[in-house]
């Protein structure tokens, strides 16, 4: 055997896969498939038990449902005296509101405390009559009637309370974009005055896609 044949044989030997590598890869793929199936079943189970508007829960942000997008509204409450209230109706941008028959599936509130936040606030979403002026008296009654669960957000040394989100599922109600003006975000400042530089609320409204939604996040 000349030198060129010897070098070629050496390269061929080096190309041979190590024994057991193929079976190890197959075993890893099989384990991954099993894990994926288990996660899929778990997600389906959790989705089946997703709460309604009367029983919302705290969740992390997630991707929109197929065929849906979301529009975000940012609310910065004004100063709220200790023991007083603030209410703001959900008013979507005109470019979205004009498609008033598009269905809304979920509303999520995210509480974003600013560096000076040191209070305790209660936050909720309520369907309120068009005639309601969202006065302190009216909002107080809504918090007191127990008809809507409340997110209690308190100061946390880490900066953000572990549970800072509240999700409302409107799928069963067949609510649409036009209905959103009937809903309002309500805030109660429990222990002391809430200043204007302490808190921001992000309201994400998940709705069916509309022609302008190509520029909205998905």
UniProtKB/Swiss-Prot annotation:
It holds the Pfam family Cucumo_coat. GO terms for molecular function: RNA binding; structural molecule activity. The N-terminal arginine-rich stretch does not seem to be the major RNA-binding region that allows formation of an infectious ribonucleoprotein complex. The modification N-acetylmethionine is found at residue 1. One of its GO terms (cellular component) is viral nucleocapsid. Belongs to the cucumovirus capsid protein family. It comes from Cucumber mosaic virus (strain Ixora). Residues 1-10 have a biased composition (Low complexity). The keyword Repressor does not apply. Residues 11-21 have a biased composition (Basic residues). Its main location: virion. This is Capsid protein. Capsid protein. Probably binds RNA and plays a role in packaging. Keywords: Acetylation, Capsid protein, Ribonucleoprotein, RNA-binding, T=3 icosahedral capsid protein, Viral nucleoprotein, Virion. It comes from the Viruses. InterPro entries: Cucumovirus_coat, Cucumovirus_coat_Asu_sf. The keyword RNA-binding applies. Residues 1-30 are annotated as: Disordered. It is found in: Virion.
């Amino acid at each position: 055997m000349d030198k060129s044949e010897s070098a070629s044989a050496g390269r061929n030997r080096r190309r041979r896969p190590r024994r057991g590598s193929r079976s190890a890869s197959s075993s890893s793929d099989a384990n991954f498939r099993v894990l994926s199936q288990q996660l899929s079943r778990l997600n389906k189970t959790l989705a089946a038990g997703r709460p309604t508007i009367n029983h919302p829960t705290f969740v992390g942000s997630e991707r929109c449902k197929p065929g849906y997008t979301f529009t975000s509204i940012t609310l910065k409450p004004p100063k709220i005296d200790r023991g007083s209230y603030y209410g703001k109706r959900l008013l979507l941008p005109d470019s979205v509101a004009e498609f008033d028959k598009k269905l809304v599936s979920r509303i999520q509130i995210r509480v974003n405390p600013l560096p000076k936040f040191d209070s305790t606030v209660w936050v909720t979403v309520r369907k309120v009559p068009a005639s309601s002026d969202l006065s302190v008296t009216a909002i107080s009654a809504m918090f007191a009637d127990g008809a809507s669960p409340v997110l209690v957000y308190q100061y946390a040394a880490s900066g953000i309370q572990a549970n800072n989100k509240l999700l409302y599922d409107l799928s069963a109600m067949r609510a649409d974009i036009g209905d959103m003006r009937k809903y309002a975000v309500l805030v109660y400042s429990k222990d002391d005055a809430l200043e204007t530089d302490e808190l921001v609320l992000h309201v994400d409204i998940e709705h069916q896609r509309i022609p302008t939604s190509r520029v909205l996040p998905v």
